[in-house]
């Protein structure tokens, strides 16, 4: 398996650590913002793709009327397992699905939503074409992507901190994948290639990421994301060392805790 193949694997202990450490600091601050972009619409069926451990699914369940049917999908069974272990307070249909080949008929959802998942799709235009296919005319696709890593304090600090462990080939997962798809021109191009003809609304959204202590963030990024696969692929014995280095760098920059850092994303809304 190549390094780039491991970019999309959220397995083993990653889903639990992801939910425990990464979701509260990185994803919860943006989940409500994304769902609010759907609230003014009359909806009956909503599809979530790349749902992960369900942080946006929980926001959908809380913020949308109880009459709206929610279907949540993810490529990784381990992430869905973790998501289903958390009470949603209302029925949600969970399905394993590849965003590049959605197992749903044409025009079957009023809206499709995706939080911080698009960056992982190997063929974004194809994924957008699948979203386009399952939406009716007037249906809406809302998603967000991380802005460049330099605008996001915690992953940027972690990425720089662990680089000296691997001087010949530093792990760049976060810069390459989660923070590697932020060009407005490229996003618009890929949406057009996927069939969308209306101009997307793209908004910069800035939030604060918070954690009780630097180690929580070090655990989140080093062990709760595919960066772990990248580190262990180089030397599995250095995962602990990488986490220690990241903790030290975060402590030096943000203090011993609780800590606060800037997070920035792009929120995209496009209508079929």
Residue spans for each PLM region:
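Conserved class I S-adenosyl-L-methionine
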Residues: 1-44, 55-59, 63, 79-86, ...
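Short conserved AdoMet
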Residues: 39, 65, 87-88, 122, ...
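Conserved catalytic/acceptor-binding region of the Class I
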Residues: 125-126, 132-212, 228
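Conserved Class I S-adenosyl-L-methionine
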Residues: 3, 7, 15, 53-55, ...
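A short SAM/SAH-binding and catalytic strip from SAM-dependent methyltransferases
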Residues: 110-124, 147
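Class I SAM-dependent methyltransferase SAM/SAH-binding core
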Residues: 45-102, 111, 126
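Conserved hydrophobic residues forming the short capping helix/wall of the S-adenosyl-L-methionine
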Residues: 61-64, 87, 162, 191, ...
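Short amphipathic alpha-helix with an adjacent loop that forms part of the alpha/beta core around
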Residues: 104-106
């Amino acid at each position: 398996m190549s390094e780039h193949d491991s970019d999309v694997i959220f397995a083993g202990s990653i889903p639990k650590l992801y939910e425990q450490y990464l979701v509260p600091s990185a994803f919860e601050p943006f989940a409500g913002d994304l769902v609010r972009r759907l609230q003014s619409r009359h909806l009956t069926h909503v599809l979530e793709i790349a749902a992960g451990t369900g942080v946006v699914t929980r926001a959908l369940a809380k913020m949308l009327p109880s009459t709206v049917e929610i279907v949540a999908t993810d490529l990784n069974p381990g992430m869905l397992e973790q998501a289903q272990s958390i009470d949603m307070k209302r029925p949600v249909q969970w399905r394993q699905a590849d965003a590049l080949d959605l197992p749903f008929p044409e025009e079957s959802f009023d809206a499709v939503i995706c939080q911080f998942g698009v960056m992982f799709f190997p063929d974004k235009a194809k994924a957008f074409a699948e979203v386009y296919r399952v939406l009716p005319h007037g249906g809406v696709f809302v998603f967000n992507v991380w802005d460049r890593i330099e605008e996001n304090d915690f992953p940027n600090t972690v990425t720089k901190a662990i680089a000296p462990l691997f001087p010949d080939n530093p792990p760049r997962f976060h810069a390459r994948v989660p923070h590697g798809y932020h060009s407005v021109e490229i996003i618009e191009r890929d949406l057009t290639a996927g069939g969308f003809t209306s101009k997307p609304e793209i908004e910069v959204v800035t939030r604060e990421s918070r954690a009780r202590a630097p180690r929580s963030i070090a655990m989140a990024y080093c062990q709760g994301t595919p960066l772990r696969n990248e580190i262990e692929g180089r030397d599995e014995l250095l995962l602990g060392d990488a986490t220690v280095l990241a903790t030290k760098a975060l402590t030096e920059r943000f203090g011993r805790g609780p800590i606060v850092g800037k997070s920035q994303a792009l929120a995209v809304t496009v209508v079929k």
